[in-house]
């Protein structure tokens, strides 16, 4: 869940007040997407999503924000999406693509500043490792640099979620993606 979600905020308040070594955070790096995951885009494109909806979402990321924040700024009360996006939605696939796009956040790394002492674990979310050995949507080089500078001294695991977007009759490359992610982590950690 997002750091601005009321349930997350309630948990954070309890965590801080109790200051127990048994309460902490597991941060999901999916909150640091720089781009919409390409595997999701390709999957919805395969299903027939309107290319204009796809481009609309890509433009939001390219502008330096994410759909969740952009929609919150542009929406009129009672509407899920801005009017210009609603006009482009022609099918359930378009609607789902736009709705799910709000789950890929572009948070500033410093959102973690006050929580570093409470972070017990990092879920290194990956959707697609490229041939160049980097995650397509998330800059792990930047994430790890931030965590090092902030004093984080815990674990980063690999959480592969690209499998949910694999096209029919295509192999799920889960092992290959996890291995590539672990190699990338070692490289950025200097191991």
Specify the residue positions occupied by each region the protein language model found.
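Active-site segments of SGNH/GDSL-like serine hydrolases
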Residues: 1-2
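Histidine-acidic metal/acid-base catalytic patches
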Residues: 5-191
């Amino acid at each position: 869940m997002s750091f601005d979600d009321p349930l997350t905020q309630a948990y954070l308040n309890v965590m801080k007040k109790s200051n127990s070594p048994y309460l902490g955070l597991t941060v999901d790096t999916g909150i640091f997407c720089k781009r919409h995951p390409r595997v999701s885009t390709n999957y919805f494109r395969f299903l027939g999503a309107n290319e204009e909806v796809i481009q609309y979402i890509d433009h939001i990321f390219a502008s330096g924000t994410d759909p969740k924040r952009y929609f919150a700024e542009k929406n009129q009360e009672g509407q899920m999406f801005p009017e210009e996006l609603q006009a482009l939605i022609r099918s359930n696939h378009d609607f789902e693509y736009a709705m799910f796009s709000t789950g890929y956040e572009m948070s500033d790394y410093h959102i973690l500043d006050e929580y570093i002492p409470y972070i017990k674990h990092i879920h290194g979310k990956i959707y697609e490792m490229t041939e160049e050995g980097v995650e397509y949507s998330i800059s792990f080089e930047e994430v790890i640099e931030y965590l090092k500078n902030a004093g984080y001294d815990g674990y980063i695991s690999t959480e592969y979620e690209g499998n949910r977007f694999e096209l029919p009759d295509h192999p799920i490359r889960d092992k290959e993606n996890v291995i590539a992610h672990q190699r990338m982590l070692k490289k950025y950690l200097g191991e």
